[in-house]
From Swiss-Prot:
SUPFAM superfamilies to which the protein is assigned, alphabetical: P-loop containing nucleoside triphosphate hydrolases
Enzyme class: transferase
Designated name of the protein: Shikimate kinase
GO BP terms, alphabetized: amino acid biosynthetic process; aromatic amino acid family biosynthetic process; chorismate biosynthetic process
Keywords: Amino-acid biosynthesis, Aromatic amino acid biosynthesis, ATP-binding, Cytoplasm, Kinase, Magnesium, Metal-binding, Nucleotide-binding, Transferase
Role noted for this protein: Catalyzes the specific phosphorylation of the 3-hydroxyl group of shikimic acid using ATP as a cosubstrate.
Length: 171
Protein backbone atom coordinates (compact mmCIF):
# COMPACT_ATOMS: atom_id res chain seq x y z
CA UNK A 1 0.00 0.00 0.00
CA UNK A 2 2.83 2.42 0.71
CA UNK A 3 3.49 2.98 -3.01
CA UNK A 4 0.42 5.23 -3.22
CA UNK A 5 1.37 8.51 -1.59
CA UNK A 6 -2.06 10.14 -1.52
CA UNK A 7 -4.45 9.45 1.33
CA UNK A 8 -8.13 10.10 0.75
CA UNK A 9 -10.50 10.25 3.73
CA UNK A 10 -14.10 9.24 3.15
CA UNK A 11 -16.97 8.89 5.58
CA UNK A 12 -20.18 10.51 6.75
CA UNK A 13 -20.71 14.02 8.06
CA UNK A 14 -19.28 14.29 11.55
CA UNK A 15 -16.79 11.43 11.16
CA UNK A 16 -13.89 13.84 11.61
CA UNK A 17 -12.46 13.82 8.09
CA UNK A 18 -11.24 17.43 8.12
CA UNK A 19 -9.85 17.41 11.66
CA UNK A 20 -8.21 14.00 11.36
CA UNK A 21 -6.95 14.90 7.88
CA UNK A 22 -5.13 17.97 9.19
CA UNK A 23 -3.39 15.90 11.87
CA UNK A 24 -2.53 13.15 9.42
CA UNK A 25 -1.07 15.57 6.87
CA UNK A 26 1.02 17.29 9.53
CA UNK A 27 2.34 13.99 10.91
CA UNK A 28 3.25 12.69 7.43
CA UNK A 29 4.50 16.04 6.08
CA UNK A 30 1.91 16.02 3.31
CA UNK A 31 -0.32 18.79 1.96
CA UNK A 32 -3.85 18.86 3.37
CA UNK A 33 -6.87 19.60 1.20
CA UNK A 34 -10.57 19.64 2.02
CA UNK A 35 -12.87 19.30 -0.99
CA UNK A 36 -15.62 21.42 0.60
CA UNK A 37 -13.15 24.22 1.39
CA UNK A 38 -11.81 24.03 -2.15
CA UNK A 39 -15.34 24.39 -3.56
CA UNK A 40 -15.89 27.42 -1.33
CA UNK A 41 -12.57 28.89 -2.43
CA UNK A 42 -13.34 28.42 -6.12
CA UNK A 43 -16.89 29.76 -5.92
CA UNK A 44 -16.24 32.52 -3.40
CA UNK A 45 -19.29 31.32 -1.48
CA UNK A 46 -20.07 28.81 1.24
CA UNK A 47 -21.52 25.36 0.61
CA UNK A 48 -24.99 26.36 1.86
CA UNK A 49 -25.10 29.18 -0.72
CA UNK A 50 -24.04 26.83 -3.53
CA UNK A 51 -26.82 24.42 -2.50
CA UNK A 52 -29.37 27.26 -2.36
CA UNK A 53 -28.46 28.73 -5.73
CA UNK A 54 -27.39 25.69 -7.75
CA UNK A 55 -29.15 22.89 -5.90
CA UNK A 56 -27.57 19.62 -4.87
CA UNK A 57 -26.88 18.66 -8.50
CA UNK A 58 -24.91 21.87 -9.12
CA UNK A 59 -22.95 21.30 -5.94
CA UNK A 60 -22.21 17.68 -6.86
CA UNK A 61 -20.96 18.75 -10.31
CA UNK A 62 -18.55 21.19 -8.68
CA UNK A 63 -17.49 18.53 -6.18
CA UNK A 64 -16.74 16.02 -8.95
CA UNK A 65 -14.48 18.53 -10.71
CA UNK A 66 -12.69 19.55 -7.50
CA UNK A 67 -12.01 15.95 -6.48
CA UNK A 68 -10.80 15.12 -10.00
CA UNK A 69 -8.37 18.05 -9.84
CA UNK A 70 -7.13 17.39 -6.30
CA UNK A 71 -6.63 13.65 -6.76
CA UNK A 72 -4.20 14.37 -9.61
CA UNK A 73 -1.82 15.98 -7.11
CA UNK A 74 0.85 13.91 -5.40
CA UNK A 75 1.60 13.70 -1.69
CA UNK A 76 -1.70 14.94 -0.30
CA UNK A 77 -4.26 14.08 2.33
CA UNK A 78 -7.75 14.86 1.02
CA UNK A 79 -10.86 15.11 3.20
CA UNK A 80 -13.82 14.50 0.90
CA UNK A 81 -17.42 15.56 1.37
CA UNK A 82 -19.67 12.90 2.87
CA UNK A 83 -21.81 12.62 -0.26
CA UNK A 84 -18.99 12.61 -2.79
CA UNK A 85 -18.90 8.82 -2.58
CA UNK A 86 -22.19 8.64 -4.50
CA UNK A 87 -20.41 9.72 -7.69
CA UNK A 88 -18.95 6.77 -9.60
CA UNK A 89 -16.39 9.13 -11.17
CA UNK A 90 -15.23 10.26 -7.73
CA UNK A 91 -15.08 6.68 -6.43
CA UNK A 92 -12.98 5.68 -9.45
CA UNK A 93 -10.61 8.64 -9.00
CA UNK A 94 -10.16 7.97 -5.29
CA UNK A 95 -9.52 4.25 -5.80
CA UNK A 96 -7.09 4.76 -8.68
CA UNK A 97 -5.07 7.65 -7.28
CA UNK A 98 -4.44 6.91 -3.62
CA UNK A 99 -5.20 5.03 -0.45
CA UNK A 100 -8.82 5.34 0.65
CA UNK A 101 -9.45 5.45 4.39
CA UNK A 102 -13.06 5.14 5.55
CA UNK A 103 -13.63 6.96 8.83
CA UNK A 104 -16.55 5.10 10.34
CA UNK A 105 -18.76 6.56 13.07
CA UNK A 106 -22.16 5.92 14.64
CA UNK A 107 -25.31 7.92 13.93
CA UNK A 108 -25.29 9.04 17.59
CA UNK A 109 -21.82 10.54 17.18
CA UNK A 110 -22.80 12.17 13.89
CA UNK A 111 -25.80 13.82 15.54
CA UNK A 112 -23.70 15.01 18.48
CA UNK A 113 -20.94 16.38 16.25
CA UNK A 114 -23.18 18.11 13.68
CA UNK A 115 -26.16 19.36 15.68
CA UNK A 116 -24.97 22.97 16.00
CA UNK A 117 -23.39 23.22 12.56
CA UNK A 118 -25.55 25.39 10.30
CA UNK A 119 -23.19 24.88 7.35
CA UNK A 120 -24.61 21.44 6.53
CA UNK A 121 -27.53 22.01 4.14
CA UNK A 122 -28.80 18.44 4.21
CA UNK A 123 -29.25 18.61 8.00
CA UNK A 124 -31.32 21.80 8.13
CA UNK A 125 -34.49 19.80 8.75
CA UNK A 126 -36.72 18.91 11.70
CA UNK A 127 -35.22 15.43 12.15
CA UNK A 128 -31.53 15.37 11.18
CA UNK A 129 -31.14 11.89 12.73
CA UNK A 130 -33.55 10.47 10.16
CA UNK A 131 -31.60 12.17 7.35
CA UNK A 132 -28.33 10.74 8.68
CA UNK A 133 -29.84 7.25 8.94
CA UNK A 134 -31.13 7.43 5.36
CA UNK A 135 -27.79 8.70 4.08
CA UNK A 136 -25.94 5.94 5.95
CA UNK A 137 -28.12 3.30 4.32
CA UNK A 138 -27.12 4.53 0.86
CA UNK A 139 -23.54 5.65 1.48
CA UNK A 140 -22.02 3.20 3.97
CA UNK A 141 -21.86 0.32 1.45
CA UNK A 142 -20.10 2.66 -1.00
CA UNK A 143 -17.55 3.76 1.62
CA UNK A 144 -16.87 0.10 2.42
CA UNK A 145 -16.61 -0.82 -1.27
CA UNK A 146 -13.68 1.49 -1.99
CA UNK A 147 -11.96 1.55 1.41
CA UNK A 148 -8.43 0.22 1.67
CA UNK A 149 -8.61 0.77 5.44
CA UNK A 150 -11.55 1.27 7.83
CA UNK A 151 -11.01 3.15 11.10
CA UNK A 152 -13.64 3.82 13.77
CA UNK A 153 -13.60 7.40 15.05
CA UNK A 154 -16.25 7.31 17.78
CA UNK A 155 -14.44 7.46 21.10
CA UNK A 156 -10.97 8.66 20.16
CA UNK A 157 -9.29 11.99 19.59
CA UNK A 158 -8.39 13.06 16.07
CA UNK A 159 -4.70 12.68 16.85
CA UNK A 160 -5.14 9.09 18.08
CA UNK A 161 -7.13 8.21 14.95
CA UNK A 162 -4.44 9.79 12.75
CA UNK A 163 -1.83 7.63 14.49
CA UNK A 164 -3.96 4.52 13.96
CA UNK A 165 -4.20 5.31 10.25
CA UNK A 166 -0.43 5.72 10.00
CA UNK A 167 0.08 2.38 11.77
CA UNK A 168 -2.42 0.57 9.56
CA UNK A 169 -0.83 1.98 6.41
CA UNK A 170 2.65 1.05 7.56
CA UNK A 171 4.02 4.58 7.14
Amino acid sequence: MAEKRNIFLVGPMGAGKSTIGRHLAQMLHLEFHDSDQEIESRTGADIAWVFDVEGEEGFRNRETQVVADLTEKQGIVLATGGGSIQSKEIRNNLSARGIVVYLETTIDKQVARTQRDKRRPLLQVDDPREVLENLAEVRNPLYEEIADVIVKTDEQSAKVVANQIIEQLGF
